[in-house]
Amino acid sequence: QCYVSQACFGRSANRGECAQFCRLPFSLVDADGKTIVRNKHLLSLKDLNQSEVLEELLDAGATSLKIEGRLKDVTYVKNVTAAYRRKLDAIFARRKEYTRASSGTCRFDFQPQLDKSFSRGFTHYFLQGRGGEITSFDTPKSLGEEMGTLKEQRGGYITVAGVKPFHNGDGVCFLDEQGRLQGFRINRVDGNKLYPAGEVPRIKPRTRLYRNFDQEFERILTRKSSERKIGVCWELADTSFGFSLTAADEDDNRVTLSFPYPKEPARTPQADNLRSQLAKLGNTPFEVAGHLSEEASGIRLNLSENWFLPASVVADWRRQVIDRLIVAPRVF
């Protein structure tokens, strides 16, 4: 816990109101009044990143993880949670003694990458012993992903030595000769030539260039690019007065509704049509568990005969059952 924000500004960092005291610039002066360091962010630490040691954390007994995300936007949260979700799922696939705390399956239409979201550089601090730089003295702002170095600068463009592609609209930053963070927005990209929007900043050759805003990546994240689906199993059965439809999800929630309906033998096989209708879960948080086959546990047809049931009737029953299942308690 940290109390410096409360002591200096009356805002408690332990209650989500940190005043970011540690991100301010300071000068370091010795006992003789000699300035050792001037106007550097001497208390600014890099961001904690334990994504590469998740398995060790699980083996040590960790059962939940806290992800840095105070005052971050939706694209940050989506990218970071997706990165950890994928790594954890890969561990769970190998280590059957571990299971996720919540139900469902998460899918992403993008490749998560932590250094594309806000970060001051990463550190694991002292989890694996002392070693490596943990501070970010030059700037408390986001550097982003390292893209290469400045090869040359002439006219209205700069040339980058690097293999990662830039996009129109990307944000680029660098540390100037005084160690101050500078940056510009790219107006146009032509191969490894970048044409900045506005005045071209003066950059020393071989200066490291970072991308702290990826236009294309942000565009992907702002649209629907992830979903979570909870597996559900169906059972359609006939009763003495009609039919019953049961849905059971991964959280052991179960809903059964009975529907009076006349029984009429069908002229053609109905199994495929019934499975198709029950599988249409659309924008609900559910999907059929398993595969749509006769042997699958996802959809079971417990019918004494090949009854005729119109698609519209089955669809209505399906909606009624799902509406009940949605409000059932579950772990998110």
Task: Label each region the model flagged.
Residues 1-332:
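Surface-exposed amphipathic alpha-helical tracts and adjacent flexible/coil segments at the periphery
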